[in-house]
């Protein structure tokens, strides 16, 4: 049973995958998207679901610090609903508050250059989201 983790932004979707036992999350890739043109990366996500035999997807839900859901959170909920309908899979939302900051701290502590951090931050945020979900089980 593999689980895909997604950090959905306005320009990219960070992707992480669990191991087969569902214990650890590894960064996979970052998919470029364009919301204005209706390009959400669903084709690539579908390919990854087939390639890795995924049976569940975890989508990060950005909440405000007071727990409310703003416009970005609503967009992520719609993204998740579209995935659920398209792929006929279990798609769950996971509170992603501070996941990007946690990913940034991990990369800084690993002495990753600013340029390289910018390239992998979304993928690492997806890892933080997915690992949080896996650890809760």
UniProtKB/Swiss-Prot annotation:
Pfam families: RuvX. InterPro entries: RNaseH-like_sf, YqgF, YqgF/RNaseH-like_dom, YqgF/RNaseH-like_dom_sf. GO terms for biological process: rRNA 5'-end processing. Keywords: Cytoplasm, Hydrolase, Nuclease, Ribosome biogenesis. It comes from the Bacteria. Gene3D superfamilies: YqgF/RNase H-like domain. GO terms for cellular component: cytosol. It is found in: Cytoplasm. It is an enzyme of class 3 (hydrolase). Belongs to the YqgF nuclease family. Could be a nuclease involved in processing of the 5'-end of pre-16S rRNA. HAMAP family: Nuclease_YqgF (MF_00651). This is Putative pre-16S rRNA nuclease. It comes from Bacillus anthracis.
């Amino acid at each position: 049973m593999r689980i895909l983790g997604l950090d959905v932004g306005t320009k990219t979707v960070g992707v992480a995958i669990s191991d087969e036992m569902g214990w650890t999350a590894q960064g996979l890739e970052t998919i470029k998207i364009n919301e204005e043109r209706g390009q959400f990366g669903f084709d690539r996500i579908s390919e990854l679901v087939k390639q890795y035999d995924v049976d569940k997807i975890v989508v990060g839900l950005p909440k405000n610090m007071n727990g409310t859901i703003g416009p970005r959170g609503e967009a992520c909920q719609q993204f998740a609903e579209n995935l659920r309908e398209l792929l006929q899979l279990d798609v769950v939302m996971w509170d992603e508050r501070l996941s990007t900051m946690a990913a940034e701290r991990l990369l800084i502590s690993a002495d990753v250059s600013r340029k390289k951090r910018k390239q992998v931050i979304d993928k690492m945020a997806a890892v933080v989201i997915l690992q949080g979900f896996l650890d809760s089980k």
